[in-house]
């Protein structure tokens, strides 16, 4: 829920995120492993409002199906977002809302195919100077189909301007199975 101060830039570089999915293709089991590392640049536009520019980054995928292994790699989509802090008049509890557009600019096989527009909110609780927890709820639409995502996160300070996060991503889209992902990353404030 933190907002980058006006005139400052924060660079969020995600550590490689792994996702694993099993499915059935033509009655045969298929296993897919994906590794991805994303980047977000944040800058303050005015007090309590920031601009975020993101890139889904490089991605590697391995699919095992009918005894064969197929690997691919490519570059992901870009995103633009505005995030607004909501003043709750509380020293430990904070909230922010965000509107985002993910633009389908990535390589074939590594893009969302159609642009995604979303709104979301995050509530964060700061336990102490070193640890915080948060929950993010996001509602999105892509080509007329809706989805909801919930992301509980644990944040921790490492040293100086370096901090980290670990998160569980739960997503449910129309006519799709539930999706789960684990992620972690580092944040270095410039």
Residue ranges of model-derived segments:
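Transmembrane beta-barrel domains of Gram-negative outer membranes and organellar outer membranes
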Residues: 1-190
């Amino acid at each position: 829920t933190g907002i980058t101060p006006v005139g400052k830039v924060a660079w969020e570089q995600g550590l490689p995120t792994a996702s694993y999915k099993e499915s059935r293709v033509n009655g045969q089991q298929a296993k897919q492993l994906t590794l991805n590392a994303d980047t977000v640049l944040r800058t303050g536009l005015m007090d309590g409002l920031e601009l975020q520019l993101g890139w889904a980054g490089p991605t590697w995928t391995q699919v095992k199906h009918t005894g064969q292994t197929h690997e691919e790699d490519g570059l992901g989509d870009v995103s633009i977002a505005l995030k607004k802090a909501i003043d709750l008049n509380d020293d430990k509890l904070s909230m922010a809302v965000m509107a985002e557009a993910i633009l389908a600019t990535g390589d074939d096989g590594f893009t969302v195919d159609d642009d995604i527009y979303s709104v979301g909110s995050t509530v964060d609780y700061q336990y102490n100077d070193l640890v915080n927890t948060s929950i993010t709820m996001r509602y999105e639409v892509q080509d007329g189909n809706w989805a909801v995502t919930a992301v509980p996160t644990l944040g921790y300070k490492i040293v100086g301007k370096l901090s980290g996060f670990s998160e569980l991503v739960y997503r449910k889209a129309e006519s799709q199975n539930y999706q789960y992902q684990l992620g972690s990353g580092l944040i270095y404030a410039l």
